[in-house]
């Protein structure tokens, strides 16, 4: 576990057969056989000096927690996550619903995009339009340009990337971890 900012990665040709040297903000370095780059938007900056072009763009997700006017006792018939028009819905307690989407380019939240999400692009049912926002938050993620997400690649011996989880990252995490483990065990 590295509890410091990685500022540079270089190939290591001199140190006990370790393939890579990781330079840290604290002016220290670590020699490693494998590096798994999971740095989202910083991935490009770390890999470009090594000659690898990875194109990622920022994409913003917005989430709201809604208090529904009426309690819903039918949550057991609701799937764990419901997706409609790229909007995710998760039931949360008997009268709460979490609603979110990761569809906005850039890093600044848009009130218009949030309103479109809340209105489900003008298809929102009445029970949803009558709900009250009790909490909201947003976050920036990395989306691959011109490639499917997530990016799972072995760029060189011992240099793996696992990034670009701009949607469904939590669902893909077990598979991504398995892929990384297989790549490391195969070498």
Description of each model-found segment:
Residues 173-187:
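Internal hydrophobic alpha-helix adjacent to the cofactor/substrate pocket in enzyme cavities
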Residues 159-172:
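Glycine-rich phosphate/pyrophosphate-binding beta-alpha loops
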Residues 2, 36, 160-162:
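Hydrophobic/aromatic beta-strand patches that form the interior of the parallel beta-sheet core
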Residues 2-21:
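A conserved short coil-to-beta-strand element within the FAD-binding core of flavoproteins
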Residues 21-23, 98, 160-161:
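General beta-strand recognition
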Residues 34, 39-157:
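Active-site substrate-recognition segment that forms the wall
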Residues 25-34:
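Core beta-strand elements of the Rossmann-like FAD/NAD(P) dinucleotide-binding domain
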């Amino acid at each position: 576990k590295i509890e410091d900012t990685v500022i540079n990665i270089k190939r290591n040709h001199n140190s006990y057969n370790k393939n890579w040297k990781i330079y840290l903000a604290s002016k220290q370095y670590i020699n490693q056989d494998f590096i798994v780059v999971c740095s989202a938007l910083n991935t490009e900056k770390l890999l470009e000096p090594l000659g690898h072009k990875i194109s990622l763009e920022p994409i913003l997700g917005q989430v709201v927690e809604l208090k529904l006017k009426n309690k819903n006792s039918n949550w057991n018939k609701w799937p764990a996550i419901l997706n409609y028009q790229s909007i995710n819905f998760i039931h949360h307690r008997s009268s709460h619903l979490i609603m979110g989407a990761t569809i906005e380019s850039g890093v600044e939240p848009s009130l218009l995009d949030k309103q479109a999400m809340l209105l489900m692009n003008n298809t929102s049912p009445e029970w949803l339009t009558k709900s009250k926002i009790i909490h909201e938050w947003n976050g920036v993620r990395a989306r691959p340009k011109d490639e499917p997400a997530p990016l799972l690649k072995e760029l060189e011996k011992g240099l793996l990337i696992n990034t670009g989880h701009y949607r469904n990252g939590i669902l893909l995490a077990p598979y991504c971890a398995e892929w990384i483990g297989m790549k490391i065990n195969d070498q």
